[in-house]
Amino acid sequence: MHQYRRFSAPPALLGATLMAALAPASAQVAPAALAECAAIAADNDRLACFDRLSGRPARPAVAPRQDAAAPAPGTGAAAAAAPAAAAAPAGSESMFDKAWGFDPSSSRYGLSPYGANYLLVGRYTNDVNMAVYQPLFDSGLFKPGTTIDSTEAAFQLSFKFRLWTTDDRRWGLWAAYTQQSQWQVYNDSGNASRPFRETNYMPELILSYRPGTQWGDWKWNLATLALNHQSNGRSDVLSRSWNRVIGGVGVENGNFALLGRLWWRIPESSDSDDNPTISDYYGWGDLSAIYKWRDNSFAATIRGNPSTGKGAGQLSWTSAPLLGPLRGYVKLFSGYGETMIDYNWKQTTIGVGVTLNDWL
């Protein structure tokens, strides 16, 4: 009985033999297959083709990534922003919104300008009101030769402080104060000693509201109701004062605004009324317009009493900033009542100086 001994070829020799046998077939197939894979345009399909040639198992198909669809109008992020935008006052560039702190992010108890804060280094009048001071001359208070200059300085301080407001700032209660002085700084005649000719004091309590109503391009952004006292703080024949309830409405269109006011004088007894006819000259209301152009402001105000035909008009120009917050300021006035002491005196005045702010 023959016994056969098993023969085992070395592994390296076996691998070389198999490669030699397969080489001709691979040389014929590979170039054509590679060309076919390279011709595939889609990235995923082309990679799968090369994987098959290399003997790798096919990878599971991955669905192509799709970008999240944009939310439809009125949904998603856009909808979330809508309530916030609706809560904020319309028109962030609104002159009334800035002046009266209607922006919900504004300080609850803010101090801000009210009227213009100005200094007129020169104010000239075409007709000095000497008549009202005649009792002082008659009493001998002034020496002979004392006069009132037609040129003087003038300044005004005006600010307001918010005492109360709602969370959305649409309602507010303000305390305001304005002081205007006429200073005979250039007068050294007789014993005049450069006096303050007149100073007017005007405290107010003001309720403000933002209606937020729009008609075309016009926006109604301000309504006010104020309790106003104005006096010159003097006594006897030079005393002037009155108390009013004032209602105001402000509308705007871009860089142009209108502010209209009507007032009612609170009656006083004849014994205490220093100026019973002041409404005849000062009027029942006023209308102001302001136009802003290239950081300049042009303003006009008219007021009067239709039944008497008396009143006044004022024009002013506020320049662009000259030095820090200081701006050039020119004011032209004509009519009655530039000051309380002159309420029934008609004159035309012009003043030149600087201001810290517009009235709006």
Each language-model region and where it sits:
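Long, repeat-rich segments with strong aromatic
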Residues: 285-339, 358
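Bacterial N-terminal signal peptides
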Residues: 10-21
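N-terminal secretory signal peptides that target proteins for export/translocation
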Residues: 1-7
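N-terminal signal peptide c-region/cleavage motif recognized by signal peptidases
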Residues: 22-26
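Alpha-helical, heptad-rich or low-complexity scaffold/stalk segments
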Residues: 27-63
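Outer-membrane beta-barrel initiation region
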Residues: 59-188, 192-195, 199-203
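Outer-membrane beta-barrel "beta-signal"
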Residues: 330, 347-360
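Outer-membrane pore/translocation modules
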Residues: 131-142, 149-150, 164-291, 302, ...
